[in-house]
C-alpha cells in the first residue's frame, strides 16, 4: 500500500479509502490510485486481515419478508436490492439475503434464519417492510446489531429510508376521484401477518399492522375527505401474496362483489394482475374500469400503467449507505424520498351510468 501511495502521489490513507469505497476520495483520485496499483501488481488490502483488525466480517444482510423466491420475483424488491448491491459492491462488502417469516406473535418461535445473523455472519442488516412487533426486529435491536429499515419498522432510534406513503396514497386516490369514479376497489398487499378474508368496505379495514399500508389507507381517506365525497364506495381486498396469481384471484373476487369502475392497487404487480383479469373478462380499460398501480416498476411502462413512481433503487442505495455508516460508527440518520404520479393509458373518466 505504501508503494501504491507513493506512485499515485497520495497518502496511504487515501489508498485505503479508495479500496473501501469511502467518499473521502474523489472518483478521479480513485482511478489514479487503481491505475498505480495495477502497474505495481497490487490487488488491494488483505480482506481477512482488515476484518480481524476491525472486528468485522465484511458482509451485510438484507432481511426480506417471505421467501427468497418471492423477493427476487417481485420487481419492486428486485430494484431495492439492486440499489443495495450497487453500494455494497463499491464498498467491497458482501451481501447475504435472509428471508424471515411474516409471524409477529411473541409466542411463536422466530424464523430459524436469524441465528445466522446473530452468530456474527453479518456486520449489520437492512430490514425491508418488517412489522414493528416482529420478534426478529426485537432480537436485532436487543443485540445492538447495526440496522436500518426500508419503509418499516419505524422505531425510536432506528434509522430508516422511506417515502411519504400517506401523501402518495392521497395522490393515488385523488387521481381516480378527479376522473369521476365513485365506486372504487382497492387491491392491497397483506395488511397484517395473515391476509384478511374477502371484500370489505374501507371503514371496516382496521387494524393494519403493516406501517406503509396503514399510511396508504390513511391517504385514501384523506383524499376522500378533502374532496367532500362521503358517499364514495371503496371496498378493499387483500391479496395473499405479491404475485400475479394471488393478485388475479383477489381482483376476480373484488370485481364480482363490488363492481368497481376504478381499481387502486398498492403495487404494480397487483395492478398488472387487474389488467389481466379485466382483459380475460372482456372489460375495456380504461373505458369501463380504470387501473392505477404503485411503484413504477419496469413492467408499468411496458403495460402503459398509470402509477405512483417511487425511487426504489435509490431507496436501496440510501439504506445501504446509512448501514455502512452505522457499521463504521458514524452518525445515524433517516431519509425521505420523493414520489410522483405517472399518468399513462390505464386511467380515464368514469363510465356514464
Regions found by a protein language model. Give the residues of each.
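Short acidic/polar active-site loop segments enriched in Thr and Asp
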Residues: 11, 58, 123, 181-183, ...
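Amphipathic helical "hinge" segments at domain boundaries
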Residues: 31, 35, 43-114, 124, ...
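Short beta-strand scaffold positions
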Residues: 5, 127, 264-266
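N-terminal helix-turn-helix DNA-binding module of bacterial transcription factors
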Residues: 1-58, 351-353
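Bacterial carbohydrate/catabolite-sensing allosteric modules
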Residues: 39-40, 86-90, 141-149, 153-353
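Structural motif
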Residues: 93-119, 127-130, 190, 236-257
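Short beta-strand-centered segments that line the small-molecule binding cleft or hinge
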Residues: 110-164
Amino acid at each position: 500500500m505504501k508503494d501504491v501511495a507513493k506512485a499515485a502521489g497520495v497518502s496511504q490513507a487515501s489508498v485505503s479509502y479508495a479500496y473501501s469505497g469511502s467518499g473521502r476520495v474523489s472518483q478521479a483520485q480513485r482511478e489514479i490510485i487503481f491505475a498505480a496499483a495495477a502497474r505495481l501488481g497490487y490487488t488491494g488490502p488483505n480482506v481477512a486481515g482488515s476484518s480481524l483488525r476491525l472486528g468485522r466480517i465484511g458482509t451485510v444482510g438484507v432481511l426480506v419478508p417471505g421467501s427468497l423466491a418471492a423477493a427476487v420475483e417481485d420487481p419492486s424488491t428486485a430494484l431495492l436490492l439492486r440499489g443495495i448491491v450497487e453500494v455494497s459492491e463499491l464498498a467491497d462488502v458482501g451481501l447475504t439475503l435472509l428471508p424471515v417469516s411474516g409471524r409477529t406473535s411473541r409466542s411463536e418461535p422466530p424464523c430459524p434464519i436469524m441465528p445466522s445473523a446473530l452468530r456474527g455472519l453479518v456486520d449489520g442488516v437492512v430490514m425491508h417492510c418488517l412489522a414493528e412487533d416482529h420478534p426478529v426486529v426485537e432480537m436485532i435491536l436487543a443485540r445492538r446489531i447495526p440496522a436500518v429499515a426500508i419503509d418499516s419498522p419505524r422505531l425510536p432510534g432506528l434509522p430508516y429510508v422511506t417515502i411519504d406513503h400517506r401523501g402518495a396514497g392521497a395522490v393515488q386516490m385523488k387521481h381516480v376521484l378527479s376522473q369521476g369514479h365513485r365506486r372504487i376497489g382497492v387491491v392491497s398487499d397483506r395488511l397484517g401477518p395473515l391476509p384478511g378474508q374477502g371484500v370489505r368496505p374501507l371503514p371496516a379495514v382496521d387494524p393494519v399492522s403493516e406501517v406503509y399500508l396503514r399510511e396508504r389507507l390513511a391517504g385514501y381517506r384523506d383524499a376522500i375527505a378533502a374532496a367532500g365525497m362521503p358517499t364514495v364506495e371503496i371496498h378493499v381486498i387483500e391479496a395473499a401474496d405479491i404475485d400475479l396469481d394471488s393478485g388475479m384471484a383477489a381482483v376476480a373476487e373484488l370485481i364480482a362483489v363490488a363492481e368497481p369502475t376504478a381499481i387502486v392497487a398498492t403495487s404494480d404487480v397487483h395492478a398488472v394482475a387487474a389488467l389481466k383479469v379485466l382483459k380475460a373478462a372482456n372489460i375495456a380499460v380504461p373505458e369501463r374500469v380504470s387501473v392505477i398501480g404503485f411503484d413504477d416498476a419496469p413492467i408499468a411502462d411496458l403495460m402503459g400503467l398509470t402509477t405512483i413512481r417511487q425511487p426504489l433503487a435509490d431507496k436501496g442505495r440510501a439504506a445501504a449507505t446509512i448501514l455502512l455508516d452505522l457499521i463504521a460508527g458514524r452518525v445515524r440518520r433517516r431519509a425521505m424520498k420523493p414520489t410522483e404520479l405517472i399518468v399513462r393509458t390505464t386511467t380515464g373518466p368514469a363510465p356514464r351510468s
